[in-house]
């Protein structure tokens, strides 16, 4: 097809886990529903790479690890838990894609890939944890958990309290060339889960995991840049980014320029930990080249957003 695009899709947490549905079977069902919403992109002939968040899952894995921590069965560090979440969620999405392809007669393959993202050891994020992971707590519960386990806790966009961990910016993705080759060949690749497993690289090129969780929207933006993708599609729980959110003059943003979006960011229109990183990630992708489009919308509006009739659309 003449208008075939390379699209990197960033899935929000709501695309994998709904409130009160945290079991494996429930999350696999949600993954299947999510894939069905993405299927029209693949049926249209686009090459698609999928990046997913892992905040709830990695936090729950950490809790499981701490619950069984003994001298004989020591708990795993945060970066290992991130790798476990990539394998787990990658399996759910890869299987859902396989089944959807089989059911719809689509001659495509899907694969999930453990992905490492290089970060900078001097990133100030290591001194200021901000990335929420794990379950929501009341303020009282959060302070108890913080005291008992040594966590840093913060309120998460008015939705409750959660543990927060360092969230350094991605510098590059180790497996990007392999992902690019697969995507170019028409394989639907699930990668860079949770923004990628954060690793440090020494002067000899050796890698070592570090305790952090990268924001998946920044990870998706970095992957999209390295793939030289046409479109970065950031999916969240709302149909579009909004200014004056919750006020009488609330307004959904449709077509917006880079300069306009930057001004809204500078004016404090977007909440940290919510819409702010999505808009910042969109701009970081657009800064990497011309002819690119970033879209922010809901999972349900995916097909309409790609067609240009829904969501917030920003072009370079």
Question: What do the PLM-derived regions correspond to, one by one?
Answer:
Residues 1-316:
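C-terminal catalytic "cap/lid" subdomain
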């Amino acid at each position: 097809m003449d208008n075939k695009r390379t699209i990197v899709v960033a899935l929000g947490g709501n695309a994998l886990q709904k409130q009160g549905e945290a079991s494996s079977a429930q999350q696999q069902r949600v993954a299947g529903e999510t894939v069905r919403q993405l299927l029209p992109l693949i049926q249209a002939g686009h090459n698609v790479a999928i990046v997913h968040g892992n905040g709830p899952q990695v936090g729950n894995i950490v809790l499981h690890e701490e619950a069984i921590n003994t001298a004989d069965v020591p708990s795993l560090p945060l970066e290992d838990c991130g790798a476990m979440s990539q394998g787990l969620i990658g399996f759910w999405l890869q299987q859902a894609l396989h089944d959807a392809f089989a059911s719809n007669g689509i001659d495509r393959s899907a694969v999930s890939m453990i992905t490492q993202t290089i970060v900078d050891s001097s990133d100030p994020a290591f001194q200021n944890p901000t990335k929420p992971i794990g379950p929501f707590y009341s303020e009282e519960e959060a302070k108890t958990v913080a005291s008992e386990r040594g966590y840093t806790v913060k309120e998460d966009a008015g939705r409750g309290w959660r543990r927060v961990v360092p969230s350094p910016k991605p510098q590059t993705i180790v497996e990007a060339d392999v992902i690019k080759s697969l995507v170019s060949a028409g394989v639907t690749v699930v990668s860079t889960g949770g923004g990628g497993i954060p690793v440090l690289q020494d002067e000899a090129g050796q890698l070592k995991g570090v305790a952090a969780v990268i924001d998946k929207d920044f990870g998706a933006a970095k992957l999209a840049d390295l793939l030289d993708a046409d479109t970065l599609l950031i999916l969240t729980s709302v149909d579009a980014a909004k200014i004056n959110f919750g006020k009488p003059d609330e307004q959904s943003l449709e077509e917006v320029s880079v300069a306009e979006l930057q001004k809204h960011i500078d004016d404090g229109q977007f909440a940290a930990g919510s819409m702010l990183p999505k808009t910042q990630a969109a701009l970081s992708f657009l800064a990497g080249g011309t002819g690119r489009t970033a879209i922010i919308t809901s999972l349900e509006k995916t097909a309409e957003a790609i067609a240009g009739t829904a969501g917030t659309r920003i072009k370079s």
